[in-house]
């Protein structure tokens, strides 16, 4: 397997134009404790704001699909994909480009910030699951 850089790919800046915003619905009660419902409301509002400018997809546990759809309305898509937490920027895939229109996905090995959370197997499978 080759490395993306060997094939002429590089990681665009976070602010570079892209075709979709991916988010993960907050699920880990230990992270958010009594604030989980409020955090979900904020995530929903952020998704709706972004959706005014570009497509947004929430990955969500199968049991939360209806809740996410109800919370975000028709302007935000959902994808049923089991996960442990909502930090998709850390455990999700990276999309690299070659500057000629080609896009590739990269999946890194996720270990929940040095095994901070022992239960992170579903998060470790998110990037490969999206790719």
Identify the function of each model-found stretch.
Residues 1-131:
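The feature marks the mature, well-folded catalytic cores of soluble enzymes
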């Amino acid at each position: 397997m080759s490395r993306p850089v060997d094939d002429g790919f590089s990681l665009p800046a976070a602010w570079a134009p892209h075709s979709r915003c991916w988010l993960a619905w907050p699920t880990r009660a230990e992270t958010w404790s009594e604030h989980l419902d409020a955090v979900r409301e904020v995530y929903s509002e952020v998704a709706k704001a972004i959706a005014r400018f570009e497509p947004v997809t929430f990955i969500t546990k199968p049991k939360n699909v209806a809740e996410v759809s109800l919370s975000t309305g028709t302007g935000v898509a959902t994808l049923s994909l089991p996960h442990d937490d909502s930090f998709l920027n850390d455990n999700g895939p990276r999309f690299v480009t070659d500057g000629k229109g080609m896009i590739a996905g990269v999946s890194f090995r996720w270990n929940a910030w040095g095994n901070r959370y022992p239960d992170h197997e579903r998060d470790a499978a998110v990037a490969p699951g999206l790719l």
